[in-house]
C-alpha cells in the first residue's frame, strides 16, 4: 500500500524548502556536543555527560534492545522474569547485595533503583547516586556490568521469584488487561505482537526449566543490543576509561540470533477488536489510522523534526476541539483525545489514534463523534486562529525549556539518550533545537498542516478497539453496528469548524492598586514578608534554582468542617466542579484559549480544615498568574451547561466503576476507618444530586476574605516587577483582617476510629486476590524531630515487609509501609500498610506483620537507621535546591508555626535506636489498630 501520509509530509517538506532554501530531507540534525557517544569493538554503545543538577550525584542506566517480542511461545514471560532476576544475585553482588549495598549509599530500591520490561526493550536504572567517592562510581558501573553479562540465575532464587511474579500477574490481571490479551491477536493478525504481553503466561512462569532462562540471557543480553548511559557530576574521561576497562572483555555469543524487528501488516478496510469484562471500569473506544513508522535511520534529519512538529500541531488542535465538545451537556463522551505515535504496542508501525470514554455505556455515539471530528478536520482543515494558538503554546513551552537549559536534571538527559539508543530519537542541544524551530515554525503555515490529514485518514488501515464493562441488560455492540455507525457519519454533510474566541478582558473592572505598607525580613527562610494595605501578608523568596519557574501557594484556615451535614453531597462534589470551573465570564474552554502561549496556571482545593490555591508561571507570564489568582479568589464560576455536562460525565464514570473490586474496597475501607460520611468516596448518586448554586456559594465563602490566607511565592522573581503586581492583584482582594477564620486543626469526625477494628468484606472478582489495609493511629507530639522519626519508622518497617513478605514468602508483588504525622490535634500519627496478596497466605502474612511491628519496638538496628537516614539526608539536600520544597516548607510554617525544613539534616542525624523504638511503642500503646480486608467472594456450593 502506498504511504500517502509520507507523501503529504514530503510535500510539507518541499514547501518548507521553497521558503528557506534548505532541504529538510537531507539536512542533518546536530547532536549535542556535550554528550560523549562511543561504541566498543564488541558493539556496546555508551553515552556520558557531565551535569551538576543535582550536584554530587549521577545516574547509571543500561538499556537493552530486548523485550518480550523476542520470546518463542514456550518462553513467554522470560524477558520480564530475567529483569526480576537482575536484583537476585550477580557474580560481584551475590544474593541481595545490589539492593543492600546501594541502599547503604542512599539509593532506595523502587525509587532510585528499578527496571522495566516492555515488548521491545528492557531498561535498568540506578538514579540519584551520591558519587563524591569515585569507588561508588566504579561499583555502579560494576553493577551495570553484572547485569549485562554476569547474572548468577541460581535455581533457588528463580523458584522464589516465580511466586513474586505470579502475584504481580494476579495484581495486574484486571479487566482491561484481560480484554487486551483477548483482542491483541485481532489487532495484530498473524503477528507476534498479538501474543507478547511482557508478563507472559503463568504456565511458562511456573514451569520453565532453569536452563531456559539462562539460555535466553545468553542469547539476548549481549553487547550489540546494550547501551550504557551515565549522566551526572562525573569526570567524563574517567568514566569512559572505566567503561572500556569493564565492558570491552564481554564477548558476543557464538551464533547469536538475529534481532528481528517484526513488521505489522497493512489491512484493507477496518479491523474491529471488541472485548468486554465484568471488571472493566469504563467503556472506551479507540479509532486508529495506521501508517508507516518513520524510518529510524532517517530520524537524524530535519524532516523528522518537521514531522514531529506537524503531527504535534494536529493532535493538539484536535484535542482542543474534543475538549470543547466534552463540555457540552449532550456530549456522548466524558473525555476524548488524540495521539500520534507507535501503533499501540508495535514500534514498527505508527498510527493516528482517536479515543473516547463513554459517559454511560453506549460506545456507538462516541465512535461517531470521534470519526465526525476526524472527517471534519480532514475535509475542512484547521482555522488560522486554532493554529496560531497551538503554535504559540508550542513555542512558549520550547522557550521555557530553553530558558531552563542550565537547570536540566540528570534524569532528563538520561531519558533522551535511552531513546536515542533504542529508537534513534534525535538529541540536539536545546540551544540548537530552539534555533531550528524558530526558523521552521514561522514557515509552516496552516495551509501546509491541512494537507496531511486527507492523506492519513482513509478507508483502509483502520482499526477500531472497543473495551466495555460486561453488564447485565447491556448488549455489546457488534462489528456490524460499529460499521453502520461509521457509514452514517460518512454520509453526513459536515460544516467547517467555527472557532469562537472571547475578546473581552479576563478582569473587566480592575480596582485601583493598593499599597505595600510594610516589609519584614524572614532570615530563617531567606525571604521577605510584605504587609499590604488590605491587611494581607505575602511572603516572597527569590531564588536562582530555575530560570523560568515561579511557584505560589495561598493557604486559608477555612474548610468544609465549618459546614453542616446537609451540605455533605455538595461538599463531595467540590473537586468535580473545581476540576473544570471557569472564571468570571470565561468558561473553562475560554480560559484554555486565553492561556494558549502563556505558561501560567492556578488551581483551587477545598479541604476539611483548609482551602489552598496553588499555581506556577514563568517570570514573563507572572502578570497572567496574578490575573488568575485574583479571579480565583473573587469569581469562580461554572455555567449551567458546563455543570450538567460535568454531572453526566462523572455520574456515568462512577456508575461503571461501582462493580470494580478496587472501587468497592475503597468505599468499604473508608466506612470502616472513619466516622464521618464525608470520608466515603463520591458515588454517581452524589453527583446527580449536586446543586450548582450551593457549590458555588461554598467556594465563594471559602475565598471571600483574603486576610484568611497566607500567600507565598518562590522562584526567579524580580522584586521590582513583583511589587507592583502584588499591589494591583493581591492588595485589591476583598479582605477583613479583623475577622480572620479561627485555625481549624481539629476535626474529630474525620479522624480514624478508636480501638481495634477488624472488618472483612467480599467482592466478586475474576482473578481472586485479597487486599489488606492495616493502620495504627494515635496522638503524638508534633515536633520537627517526631516528624522525621515517624518517617524513619515507616521506612524501616517497609524494608522488613519487602524482604520477608515479598522476597521470602512470595505472598505479594509490592508491599510497603508509611508512618506520617500531621498538625491535627487528636490522632495525628498514622502507620499504614496496604497491599494485594495471595488469598491462601492471608493469615500467615497478617500474623507476621503484627509480630514484626511488635518486634520493632525492641530490636531496631543501627544499620537499619543508617540506611534510611542516608537516603533521607540525600533527599533533604536535594530539596534545598528545589523551589517546590521551599514553597511547601514556608507554606507549612505559615499554617502551623513549626519549621521542619531548616536544620532537618541535623535532626535526621540525631535520631537514635531509642527514638524509633520509643515512638513506635508509644504509638502502638494507644490501642488503635485497624485491619480492613477484601476477600474474593466464594461461590456457594451447589
Place the predicted regions along the sequence by residue.
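M16 family metallopeptidases and their MPP-like homologs
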Residues: 49, 54-71, 78-79, 96-146, ...
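Positively charged n-region of N-terminal signal peptides that target proteins for export
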Residues: 1-7
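Proteolytic maturation boundary segments
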Residues: 24-48, 235-309, 314-319, 323, ...
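Hydrophobic, small-residue-rich alpha-helical packing segments that form membrane-like cores
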Residues: 157-212, 216-225, 229-231, 236-244, ...
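Active-site His/Glu-centered metal-binding helix of metallohydrolases
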Residues: 78-86, 314, 574
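Bacterial N-terminal signal peptides
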Residues: 8-19
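Peptidyl-prolyl cis-trans isomerase
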Residues: 101, 150-153, 157-158, 444-448, ...
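Non-catalytic, conformational "gating/processing" segments within enzyme and secreted inhibitor domains
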Residues: 150, 162, 176, 213-244, ...
